[in-house]
UniProtKB/Swiss-Prot annotation:
InterPro entries: DnaJ_C, DnaJ_domain, DnaJ_domain_CS, HSP40/DnaJ_pept-bd, J_dom_sf. This is DnAJ-like protein slr0093. PANTHER family: DNAJ HOMOLOG 1, MITOCHONDRIAL-RELATED. It comes from Synechocystis sp. (strain ATCC 27184 / PCC 6803 / Kazusa). GO terms for cellular component: cytosol. One of its GO terms (molecular function) is unfolded protein binding. PROSITE patterns: DNAJ_1 (PS00636), DNAJ_2 (PS50076). Keywords: Chaperone. The lineage of its organism: Bacteria, Bacillati, Cyanobacteriota, Cyanophyceae, Synechococcales. CDD domains: DnaJ, DnaJ_C. Residues 6-75 form the J domain. GO terms for biological process: chaperone cofactor-dependent protein refolding. Pfam families: DnaJ, DnaJ_C.
Length: 332
């Protein structure tokens, strides 16, 4: 391109000289959508405009070329690029779209990504390179070959930690997304691994649209309650006399303390069920709470307790190990 053919690339793209790479990229995308030949069949003016904005973007999107353009103005190509043919965008890549076969692309987005990939891939004479950004949700292919590109549009994910009480009752959380604060309502009954979708709070696209934010919920482990499906499981200690004679005891539940009858003669590890005291399920109602009884001997029995146990031992009529004594000679 001769010095007399100097073009103001900033004016062509409609950006200021201080525009960031992201702003230049966004503006090019906007103009490319408007003047693309497929959207303006037979319109020579639109075709020429498309070539012009593509030429401007090729220079301004390349930090090295942009620096020379800003420094040397109309003579920027003579600053170390005199051997490059006029109108060329690198080895094997030009901007003459006359007779270009756009039918090889599935849609216009695919063409734009390819075009930008060629402009920003060293020696890219048609090799397709894409920058993929995915945080677990659906991926989004950004402009190809941008090593320092901004995160592309699409869905994004974040992990949100909840206490068991918050997950049980539901809670509102204020989240800092960097560019804004949002309030998210977590419904009652959330579980570990549940996902909450927040519409329109994902990554912004060059079209001005935004993807969605997906929150992966993690529940802080609880010292007393564990999950079995929609049921809550807990272990509760009982004394030997309560196991033998039965008892009426207090049990912690998500709703508070409730009374539960322990039948006489229960075994250690046996579970009793509290109906409707488990985890809330919006579709099936609440699960149950399973109370696993653990018979616990006193660590420091009083003199009276020891005397009572000694009397019981002396009067015991059953051998609790009798059922397994038959296995004693199994390997003899």
């Amino acid at each position: 391109m001769a010095s007399t053919d100097f073009k103001d690339y900033y004016q062509i793209l409609g950006v200021t000289k201080t525009a960031s790479e992201a702003e230049i990229k966004k503006q090019f995308r906007k103009l490319a959508l408007k003047y693309h030949p497929d959207k303006n069949p037979g319109d020579k003016a639109a075709e020429e405009k498309f070539k012009e904005i593509s030429e401007a973007y090729e220079v301004l999107s390349d930090p090295e070329k942009r620096q020379k353009y800003d420094q040397f103005g109309r003579y920027w190509q003579q600053a170390g690029t005199a051997g490059q043919p006029s109108g060329s965008y690198g080895p094997g890549v030009g901007v003459d779209f006359g007779g270009f076969d756009f039918s090889q692309y599935g849609n216009f987005d695919e063409f734009i990504n390819e075009l930008l990939g060629r402009f920003n891939t060293p020696g890219g004479g048609g090799q397709r390179t894409s920058y993929s950004y995915s945080t677990g949700g659906p991926g989004f292919n950004d402009f190809g070959g941008f090593g320092n590109a901004q995160a592309p549009a699409g869905d994004r994910e974040a992990t949100l930690q909840l206490t068991l009480a918050e997950a049980f009752r539901g809670v509102e959380k204020r989240l800092n997304l960097g560019e804004e604060m949002v309030t998210v309502r977590i419904p009652a009954g959330a579980k570990n691994g549940s996902r909450v979708r927040v519409r329109g709070k994902g990554m912004a696209s060059p079209y001005g649209q935004r993807g969605d934010l997906y929150l992966n919920l993690q529940l802080t482990p609880h010292p007393f309650f564990q999950f079995e499906g929609d049921n809550l499981v807990c272990e509760l200690a009982i004394a030997p006399d309560e196991a033998v004679l039965g008892a009426d005891i207090s049990v912690p539940t998500p709703d508070g303390m409730v009374r539960m009858k322990v039948p006489a003669g229960v075994k250690s590890g046996q579970s009793l069920r509290l109906k409707g005291k488990g985890w809330p399920n919006p579709k099936q109602g609440r699960g149950d709470q399973l109370v696993r009884l653990i018979i616990t001997a006193p660590k420091n029995p009083s003199a009276i307790e020891r005397e009572c146990y000694e009397k019981i031992q002396a009067q015991r009529t059953e051998n609790p190990r009798q059922a397994v004594e038959k296995y004693a000679n199994l390997l003899a």
